[in-house]
Amino acid sequence: MQQVEGRNCLPAEVRIGLETLKRRRLERMRLTAQNNAGDGPPVPARSGGDALRTPANCGVRLHANNGTALPSRTTQNKDPFAKRRVDKFDMSSLEWIDKIEECPVYYPTKEEFEDPIGYIQKIAPVASKYGICKIVSPVSASVPAGVVLMKEQPGFKFMTRVQPLRLAKWAEDDTVTFFMSERKYTFRDYEKMANKVFAKKYSSASCLPAKYVEEEFWREIAFGKMDFVEYACDVDGSAFSSSPHDQLGKSNWNLKNFSRLSNSVLRLLQTPIPGVTDPMLYIGMLFSMFAWHVEDHYLYSINYHHCGAFKTWYGIPGDAAPGFEKVASQFVYNKDILVGEGEDAAFDVLLGKTTMFPPNVLLDHNVPVYKAVQKPGEFVITFPRSYHAGFSHGFNCGEAVNFAISDWFPLGSVASRRYALLNRTPLLAHEELLCRSAVLLSHKLLNSDPKSLNKSEHPHSQRCLKSCFVQLMRFQRNTRGLLAKMGSQIHYKPKTYPNLSCSMCRRDCYITHVLCGCNFDPVCLHHEQELRSCPCKSNQVVYVREDIQELEALSRKFEKDICLDKEISGFDSYKQAEKNEPFFEITRNLRNTEVNLIEDAFSGATAADAAKSSPATSTLTSFAQHDVPVLAEAIVCANQADQLYSTTEQTISSPLVKGTDAVGANSSSMADANNGTGSCNASAVEYSGNSDSESEIFRVKRRSGVSVKPASDAKTSNLSDQQVLRRLKKVRPEIQQHNKRPEDYGHCSVPSGRMSMKNLNSSSSCGEEHWRMKRRQLETQQDESSYSAKQKSYSYPSTSYSFRGEFVEMSRDAAAEVRPKRLKIRLPSSSTNRVVEQGSSGQRFTRDDKSLGCWPAI
């Protein structure tokens, strides 16, 4: 919510502005001294009487219409306060003011007023279509804001920002910057200064009609004589009284406690953020403005008007935000100040919160604009991704804070992506916030009555949270699986480990981060291409939270609770936003890819052709490409996987998974194998066709049993395909290559080794593939007699994890149905007794003999 930077490393325009202020101050002091020394009565300066006799009222000097000529300027730089004609903004007529519709106004009862967030959720389906709304409080504050700031908070002072009162061309040589003044005010001093400016401008101390002041503001900013105003924005503090007798102060609408309410998402943040979780004060004067901006991370905001003159707001609905950014990039900003192209470039400049232009520019390009005139005792709510701007009608004091409820997560994900693309440091750890909210919701679902839960957690908000969490876990599983196929090692990090930021895009790495030999800074999973092209693939270490299996189990539960088709494409108040943002296309593209692949596979089409025919319009769906080979393999072994999944579904979610399924290797890439960049070692891909969870086909699970094969039994794996074929013909001469039956694929697992899309298409490759499967079946049959003995003779090394015992029991239970293969390879002695276990899914887990899964120091 902060609008400008401090005075460290001031830009040239700011320095020029301060020099201009200093020259004007010295000139006025010289004129005052001359007038006081003359024979006649002193002539007061136009900046206002006694204000010049005390340096305390420098604000009056800033806003005065000084008719005295300044010394000629020697600098070639333009005066940052001088008004210029801006042809792109037609201000010759203000008739467009009457075309702006009013936003809705709500009058809650005292009973409804007791639950702020519940009431906001109630009005959101309608109010969010306007971007902003007003709520008139049924309870008034008994202690005025001035008393709170002067009596309850003695010594309260604040600095102001100087705002040039003009329009800008928004070109390289003409922009607007708000900068800090060199003055600290008390609340009373600022009020006196602001009232003097108002009285001098209109010869009145009373409020003027709202429409008249609105017209005056746009005339002044385009043609007027006022150079600049002062605005105290982003001032730490609150004007809500701590008195137990103040009805509003002790209510839930006290903004000091608003973000910490029971159903507020931001209460899960461990560190307070000024302006986001803690409120800030906004103390304004005549024509002080807040420029067009959207809240950080597309959060909700609530603003309470404590006292003073009215305040006019302009709001844009959240679903019209792309149109707003498009208009700004094409009709407000010149190309020379935009870094990049499109709406993201305009969004980057808008984050500076200094862009002010008349709303008629938006109306002319069919972007809806709504208006609110806020009075003392009224709240203004801005909804996620709603751009807004406004100005004050005179001295006033407001207070604002951000908040979020679960239906914010979809747009919060979009904001997180945009910050990463622009390399902006986020204020919130979005991934952590999403995971914590999902875990908390699961506890509520287990321990609360459904009726009482619906009152505290709106069903729509629940669906938004569940959908976003499932999307996050899908992406994590896909990318971790791909890295595991490349040979990356998996380690666990404790829950208490700090949440790191990605060194490339600044996202938070709450669940997973990657370290490699050539880059000792953490990298998040969103940089898959960079990780794949890294020369030290085998030296990459993927660090995963030790409670990853709890999150995976929760994701599977949420998948069963909701239908992603309906939720991702049907957010009630954000349908238009979905059409304009790639975030909402993630699941749609995954879903289309899945359907096309299944249909084409059963009709004989290749997986590559299906991938070409599926839509790929979003850069965010790059991880969907890794699902293509998984789907092809899943279709081949669907029957066996159905049987396996039904047998071991409950066991998979046991602590066993915590030890070996942490990477969720469901994103095996055949393209990598084809290019020689990775190997596909998955020997079992599970597909639950009967499950109501649509993402089961994306999951590659480790086989539920284990078998240690002696070296003598594994010799055949070193033979060439032709040798294997000849031996098979000797053993079973009735088998011929042309007698391959399609149903054979329903009773075998995909063989280990390198695979590619070409192998699925070539008839000769299919024949070799068939014989490899037959060979595996024969090996399995030969091992059946000795399987039980091998199971009993297998000894597990000591470990700090408790899942080994459950692992043995589960293996024995599943031995009748599954004959898995797990290789245990002991590296040379130079590896300091480290054992590498490679599972059937191709994942590599490194453990030390002394401490399995320990977290290495970084």
From Swiss-Prot:
GO molecular function, one term: metal ion binding
Enzyme kind, highest EC tier: oxidoreductase
Cofactor field: Fe(2+)
InterPro entries referenced in this protein's UniProt entry, alphabetically: JmjC_dom, JmjN, Znf_C5HC2
Location of the JmjN domain: 103-144
Residues that, per the record, bind Fe cation: H293, E295, H388
Compositionally biased region (Polar residues): 829-844
Composition-biased stretches (Basic and acidic residues): 737-746
Catalytic reaction(s) noted: N(6),N(6),N(6)-trimethyl-L-lysyl(9)-[histone H3] + 2 2-oxoglutarate + 2 O2 = N(6)-methyl-L-lysyl(9)-[histone H3] + 2 formaldehyde + 2 succinate + 2 CO2
Domain of life: Eukaryota
Boundaries of every JmjC domain copy: 250-420
Primary location recorded for the protein, binned into one broad class: nucleus
General function of this protein: Histone demethylase that demethylates 'Lys-9' (H3K9me) of histone H3 with a specific activity for H3K9me3 and H3K9me2. No activity on H3K4me3, H3K9me1, H3K27me2 and H3K36me3/2. Involved in the control of floral organ development by demethylating H3K9me3 and H3K9me2 in the promoter regions of DH1 and MADS47. The 'Lys-9' demethylation of these two genes is required for induction of their expression.
Protein name: Lysine-specific demethylase JMJ706
Gene source species: Oryza sativa subsp. japonica (Rice)
